[in-house]
């Protein structure tokens, strides 16, 4: 989960992942979505990029050694507040001013927020379990099967 965006040559990383995967095995990855959400959070987490589903498909479609099983955006219900928070944070350079890691998560105290986020993720998970795809989100989930 959330590894490919940390590698400068993402195609090389995916090719190696595919190479070491056993036949008929499944690969499940998640990556951050949409460069429009780029913020200091990505910088301090050493991300090289954020993706669109089309780009993840292209990474895995470089050879005919497997097939996509399922792909979707997720963290959809959080997209609008995160988009707004990151735009304001970028404009005011808030990420650089925060103490600690500078991560988005440091801007909020744990507690009630964790409970709310947990319930949101459980709700989205129940939808994803039915193989319903979200049209946008903060992250991408991609499932691939090697032939």
Annotated model-derived regions:
Residues 1-39, 52-57, 142-145:
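Conserved SAM-binding loop
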Residues 1, 43-44, 68:
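Conserved short-loop catalytic and cofactor-binding motifs
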Residues 62-66, 146:
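A structural motif corresponding to the C-terminal end of an alpha-helix
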Residues 78-147:
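A C-terminal cap/extension of S-adenosyl-L-methionine-dependent methyltransferases
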Residues 65-76:
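Conserved S-adenosyl-L-methionine
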Residues 39-59, 72-74:
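Acceptor-substrate binding/catalytic loop of class I
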Residues 42, 56, 61, 85-89, ...:
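A generic structural signal for secondary-structure junctions
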